[in-house]
């Protein structure tokens, strides 16, 4: 399903600096853009909107559609390939694809295995993808952490209890970071965790909780240098990661998730920070807000 803006709503693309500044770089009320990635050369953001893929030039502030073929409408799960030229994409048909950032034909990676595949991570060596599998597209079922080679083939399930989402490799490839409901019986109370990245001898391990909080915490993203991390925080009691509610985008040291360095209050949720949005030099990260006409976005 393609998301659209409500009457009186607009989308705002923000760039925050690790030194505390932030800048509204693009705002409009037409296409609902989501989930920024940052290109490897640092010149552009890559977002989805209206089922398509778009680039936003950070200097010129211009948006352009990436001309892709052989792929259905996209959702907001997409990750850049480590080579800087390719991108892995999740389609609304439940499959994962690879395409080039300059456009052209996309290639399907996953097969029809009775699951929807929601991509979130690519290993630093570019060989493996981490995704969430949901059986038969039944969103009442818990999401399972999975990996698959970028060339396709056999998938590897990771044994973590509870609903999981957002698996993303650490920059050194040693860990998978994600959110999970494994630590609580409270419905929807997602918390941040990590497990050792699977290799030929293991398929993960017991999840290590990064912190304990009363909020609902989703989508941990480490900076390329591994020193910092961002995530999105929903109010306590939130089930899933819905759109259009007050949320926080939080910056923390990667070694101490309990000590926020920055907290950005905004109206958003779904689409705000679904994928890794760090600049390649680890100095900035991007996110999207979706304020209504009555929402003040000039203050944190």
Each model region followed by its residue ranges:
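Sequence signature of WD/YWTD-type beta-propeller architectures
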Residues: 1-300
């Amino acid at each position: 399903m393609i998301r659209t803006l409500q009457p009186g709503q607009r989308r705002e693309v923000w760039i925050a600096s690790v030194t505390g500044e932030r800048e509204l770089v693009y705002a409009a009320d037409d296409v609902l853009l989501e989930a920024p990635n940052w290109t490897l050369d640092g010149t552009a953001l890559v977002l989805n909107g209206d089922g398509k893929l778009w680039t936003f030039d950070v200097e010129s502030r211009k948006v352009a559609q990436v001309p892709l073929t052989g792929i259905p409408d996209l959702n907001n799960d997409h990750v850049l390939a480590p080579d800087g030229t390719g991108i892995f994409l999740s389609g609304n048909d439940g499959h994962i694809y690879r395409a080039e950032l300059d456009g052209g034909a996309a290639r399907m990676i996953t097969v029809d295995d009775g699951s929807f595949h929601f991509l979130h991570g690519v290993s630093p060596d570019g060989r493996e993808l981490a995704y969430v599998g949901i059986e038969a597209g039944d969103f009442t079922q818990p999401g399972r952490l999975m990996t698959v080679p970028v060339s396709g083939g056999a998938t590897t399930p990771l044994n973590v209890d509870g609903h999981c989402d957002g698996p993303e490799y650490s920059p050194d490839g040693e860990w998978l970071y994600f959110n999970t409901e494994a630590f609580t019986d409270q419905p929807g109370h997602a918390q941040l965790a990590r497990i050792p990245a699977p290799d030929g001898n293991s398929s993960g391990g017991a999840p290590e909780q990064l912190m304990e909080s009363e909020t609902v915490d989703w989508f941990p993203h480490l900076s390329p240098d591994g020193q910092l991390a961002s995530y999105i925080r929903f109010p306590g009691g939130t089930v899933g990661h819905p759109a259009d509610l007050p949320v926080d985008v939080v910056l923390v040291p990667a070694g101490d998730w309990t000590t926020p360095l920055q907290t950005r209050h905004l109206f958003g949720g779904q689409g705000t920070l679904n994928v890794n949005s760090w600049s390649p030099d680890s100095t900035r990260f991007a996110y999207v807000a979706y304020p209504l006409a009555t929402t003040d976005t000039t203050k944190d």
